[in-house]
Amino acid sequence: MEIFLDTANIEEIRKGVAWGIVDGVTTNPTLVSKENAVFEERIKEICETVEGPVSAEVVSTDYEGMVKEAREIANLSEFVVVKIPLIPDGIKAIKTLSKEGIKTNATLVFSPLQALLAAKAGATYVSPFIGRMDDIGNTGMDIVEEIEVIFSNYGYETKIIVASVRHPQHVLEAGLIGADVVTMPFEVLEKMFKHPMTDIGLERFLNDWKKYQDYLKSKNN
C-alpha cells in the first residue's frame, strides 16, 4: 500500500516524509486555501519535499478550461498529478490529457460506474470518497471493493486512491481489500502509531532499565 498525505501543510508533509513512510500527497482547493499560500508556489514546494505523486486540482469546470489549467499545473513539476472532477467534461479532459502523457486523478468519485468511466478515459488514479459515502449511510469501502473487481476484470491500470479517510479503521479496511493507495489527513497517520500497550510496554522497559542503572551505580559506590 502507498500512503499519501491529504494536506497542503508543508510542515505536516515534511514530518511525514522524515518518517520515511509517505509516498505522495493529495491537495484540493480547500486545503490550499487554508494555508494562505500562493497555489503554484505551494505545489512546487510540496513536490520538492515529497518527490512523489502530488495531486493538484483544477478549478475550471468546462472542458477547455480544465485542459488549459491542467497543462499549466502539470508544468510545475514532473511529480504533479492533475485532479479532475468526475463530470462529463472532466472525463473528456482526462482523455485528452492522458493522450498528452499528463497524469490525472479523477476526483469526487462516488460510484464504481464513475470509476469505470475514468479508467476508460485513461485516468492514472481514481479517488473514491469513502468517508462522505459513510456519512450518507452507505458503506464507502464496498465501493472500493467493487471498483477493484471491475478494474481486475478488464485489466485497467488505473490505481485506486482511497480518499475522504476519517480514521485509522478506514486505513485498515483499505489494506484488507488490497487498495493501491490511501490518502489521509496527517492526524490519521499520527493515530496509526498509537496503541496503549505500546506506551505501557515502553514505559515498563525504561523503568526497568533505570532501576538496573541505579543498581549498578549503588554497587560502585
From Swiss-Prot:
<dbReference type="InterPro" id="IPR022999">
    <property type="entry name" value="Transaldolase_3B"/>
</dbReference>
<dbReference type="InterPro" id="IPR018225">
    <property type="entry name" value="Transaldolase_AS"/>
</dbReference>
<dbReference type="GO" id="GO:0016832">
    <property type="term" value="F:aldehyde-lyase activity"/>
</dbReference>
<keyword id="KW-0963">Cytoplasm</keyword>
<protein>
    <recommendedName>
        <fullName>Probable transaldolase</fullName>
        <ecNumber>2.2.1.2</ecNumber>
    </recommendedName>
</protein>
<comment type="pathway">
    <text>Carbohydrate degradation; pentose phosphate pathway; D-glyceraldehyde 3-phosphate and beta-D-fructose 6-phosphate from D-ribose 5-phosphate and D-xylulose 5-phosphate (non-oxidative stage): step 2/3.</text>
</comment>
<dbReference type="GO" id="GO:0005975">
    <property type="term" value="P:carbohydrate metabolic process"/>
</dbReference>
<keyword id="KW-0704">Schiff base</keyword>
<dbReference type="InterPro" id="IPR033919">
    <property type="entry name" value="TSA/FSA_arc/bac"/>
</dbReference>
<keyword id="KW-0570">Pentose shunt</keyword>
<dbReference type="InterPro" id="IPR004731">
    <property type="entry name" value="Transaldolase_3B/F6P_aldolase"/>
</dbReference>
<dbReference type="InterPro" id="IPR001585">
    <property type="entry name" value="TAL/FSA"/>
</dbReference>
<dbReference type="GO" id="GO:0004801">
    <property type="term" value="F:transaldolase activity"/>
</dbReference>
<feature type="active site" description="Schiff-base intermediate with substrate">
    <location>
        <position position="83"/>
    </location>
</feature>
<keyword id="KW-0808">Transferase</keyword>
<dbReference type="GO" id="GO:0006098">
    <property type="term" value="P:pentose-phosphate shunt"/>
</dbReference>
<dbReference type="GO" id="GO:0005737">
    <property type="term" value="C:cytoplasm"/>
</dbReference>
<dbReference type="InterPro" id="IPR013785">
    <property type="entry name" value="Aldolase_TIM"/>
</dbReference>
<comment type="similarity">
    <text>Belongs to the transaldolase family. Type 3B subfamily.</text>
</comment>
<comment type="function">
    <text>Transaldolase is important for the balance of metabolites in the pentose-phosphate pathway.</text>
</comment>
<dbReference type="Pfam" id="PF00923">
    <property type="entry name" value="TAL_FSA"/>
</dbReference>
